[in-house]
Amino acid sequence: MFIKVMFGAGCSVLVNTSCRLVNLTAHLRQKAGLPPDATIALLAEDGNLVSLEEDLKEGASRAQTMGNSLLKERAIYVLVRIIKGEDMASTRYESLLENLDDHYPELAEELRRLSGLSSVGHNWRKRMGTRRGRHEQSPTSRPRKGPD
């Protein structure tokens, strides 16, 4: 079966999960223009993060793992890059779909939570009267009526 993986500026690709995970991962890296050593994961619409790398690093037997054993068929996923922190720094999760906040605000919040970032600084959009990337008009910015 297939899944839809979203990345870039609204790009998406249908991926057949009935293949080895190592091939699926290499294909996604190539499509997204990532280096071969980039660590990636898929974030499902329900907020579940599926690491595509950890299973491959556990041993040669895991290299035979099929994509459909980890991924739900017909689901939509966002491609995520995992950036390992050096020393005591925490791991960061970076969405490879531009404007994730506009498309999936709940998933953007989940990535911030996984990265250990506070969401306090990200609520400014709500306070500024922004809804899904569109500014509401304030009373001072309404067009003025001409003389009657």
From Swiss-Prot:
PANTHER family: GENE 867-RELATED (PTHR33887:SF1), PB1 DOMAIN-CONTAINING PROTEIN (PTHR33887). Residues 123-134 have a biased composition (Basic residues). It comes from the Eukaryota. Residues 122-148 are annotated as: Disordered. Pfam families: Il2rg. This is Uncharacterized protein C22orf15.
